[in-house]
UniProtKB/Swiss-Prot annotation:
One of its GO terms (molecular function) is metal ion binding. Changing residue 309 to A: Impairs interaction with TTC3. Residues 152-409 form the Protein kinase domain. PANTHER family: RIBOSOMAL PROTEIN S6 KINASE (PTHR24351). It is linked to Defects in AKT2 are a cause of susceptibility to breast cancer (BC). AKT2 promotes metastasis of tumor cells without affecting the latency of tumor development. May play a role in glioblastoma cell survival. The modification N-acetylmethionine is found at residue 1. This is RAC-beta serine/threonine-protein kinase. It comes from Homo sapiens (Human).
Length: 481
């Protein structure tokens, strides 16, 4: 194994991802692709002080811009199926060139790929209970039977963002519903690159867990990357909770346990989900949780001219994310705390329409509980919503185990959870995986046409907004970010 060395180091101004201010950080770029930032210059290169920022430049695209400040550069890459951006600026054009050259050199040196397969023609079986091993093998072995845009009916725009769209689709051959995320290649892959960006990210590592949305297909057209993901048809948890206003502790415990099980699985693979919030939780036909990956930007991607722009839902942001410190797995336990608080208390733990005030509450305000909550539930929520990630329940080295061993989950057999042996407290009234009663009527009735074989790009639905004007995302019961 080659020894990791520091390729370049120095002060950069990094723009906050949510609170759009510039913060000085001392960055080290290493030969293994890690790009780590500290508040102070480290005494020694091998010091163990935890960095505030820890990124990788593998498979990244670099861009330069003079907005919102001169000598700015942006690093963009794909994380799972989501585009993320980080923005930096330096004092001179020469300094910017030096950094960009060094980053590009490291990124290029990491590209030792096996030639051959086109990595974006990808097909896998569904991890649902009905899939047998035999079916799975057949699905994988048929991977060369190409999936195309024409294999689907396009029903409804679920979300729209700077880099792409998410559309509810129905597979013509099976009648099954999926969410298709369509991203423009040009924003992810530099002109001289082929679309292997995606394989180097975690997309094709085929995350398999009963409570995580599986990626069913990934394929490409000449200018788009398409990800086809499961779309559970038991309705959004947001919809069910807003109808009932509050869940019993028993019901919240069931959903919480399934979320914990999924997070334990992701964390064991060094994946921080980062986006636990009510609108990313759906129910399958039997009433089990499905955590989705339909987001279009998990980071604060914004038009360089606006200083205060949000991507997603600021109510769910953990204190360490707001302070732009590096966040680890504990950020997911904060997210779990927020959604479980909503389930059991019927409202968000911190809320204000004014974002500045909201951030103040998240960072400073003590958590309050309704009197009706049991001591176990209060203790769990207080632990998950600790401001300091190191003090937070789940924030220690044993991660999910801390949460699983909390007395609120005393009655839970965790092996039974992952094997779906626990009876869901609520069963959606759907008769099959193609029953659409929890979908909006407006889009189950008819299909929208967006894919003539050779010229789907020219159709309005797939045309993206101009880079100069980035739309913000709204959320309703059927539109996620």
């Amino acid at each position: 194994m080659n020894e990791v060395s520091v390729i370049k180091e120095g002060w950069l101004h990094k723009r906050g991802e949510y609170i759009k201010t510039w913060r000085p950080r001392y960055f080290l770029l290493k030969s293994d692709g890690s790009f780590i930032g500290y508040k102070e210059r480290p005494e020694a290169p091998d010091q163990t002080l935890p960095p505030l920022n820890n990124f990788s430049v593998a498979e990244c695209q670099l861009m330069k811009t003079e907005r919102p400040r001169p000598n700015t550069f942006v690093i963009r890459c794909l994380q799972w199926t989501t585009v993320i951006e980080r923005t930096f600026h330096v004092d001179s054009p020469d300094e910017r060139e030096e950094w960009m050259r060094a980053i590009q050199m490291v990124a290029n040196s990491l590209k030792q790929r096996a030639p051959g397969e086109d990595p974006m023609d990808y097909k896998c079986g569904s991890p649902s209970d009905s899939s047998t091993t035999e079916e799975m093998e057949v699905a994988v072995s048929k991977a060369r039977a190409k999936v195309t845009m024409n294999d689907f009916d396009y029903l409804k725009l679920l979300g729209k963002g700077t880099f792409g769209k998410v559309i509810l689709v129905r597979e013509k051959a099976t009648g099954r519903y999926y969410a298709m995320k369509i991203l423009r290649k040009e924003v992810i892959i530099a002109k001289d690159e082929v679309a292997h960006t995606v394989t180097e990210s975690r997309v094709l590592q085929n995350t398999r867990h009963p409570f995580l949305t599986a990626l069913k297909y990934a394929f490409q057209t000449h200018d788009r990357l398409c990800f086809v993901m499961e779309y559970a048809n038991g309705g959004e948890l947001f919809f069910h909770l807003s109808r009932e206003r509050v869940f019993t502790e028993e019901r919240a415990r069931f959903y919480g346990a399934e979320i914990v099980s999924a997070l334990e699985y992701l964390h064991s693979r060094d994946v921080v989900y980062r986006d636990i919030k009510l609108e990313n939780l759906m129910l399958d036909k039997d009433g089990h949780i499905k955590i989705t990956d339909f987001g279009l930007c998990k980071e604060g991607i914004s038009d360089g001219a606006t200083m205060k722009t949000f991507c997603g839902t600021p109510e769910y942001l953990a204190p360490e994310v707001l302070e732009d410190n590096d966040y680890g797995r504990a950020v997911d336990w904060w997210g779990l705390g927020v959604v479980m608080y909503e389930m059991m208390c019927g409202r968000l733990p911190f809320y204000n329409q004014d974002h500045e005030r909201l951030f103040e509450l998240i960072l400073m305000e003590e958590i309050r509980f309704p009197r009706t909550l049991s001591p176990e539930a209060k203790s769990l929520l207080a632990g998950l919503l600790k401001k300091d990630p190191k003090q937070r329940l789940g924030g220690g080295p044993s991660d999910a185990k801390e949460v699983m061993e909390h007395r609120f989950f005393l009655s839970i057999n965790w092996q039974d959870v992952v094997q779906k042996k626990l009876l869901p407290p609520f069963k959606p009234q759907v008769t099959s995986e193609v029953d659409t009663r929890y979908f909006d009527d407006e889009f189950t009735a008819q299909s929208i046409t967006i894919t003539p074989p050779d010229r789907y790009d020219s159709l309005g639905l797939l045309e993206l907004d101009q880079r100069t004007h980035f739309p913000q995302f709204s959320y309703s019961a059927s539109i996620r970010e």
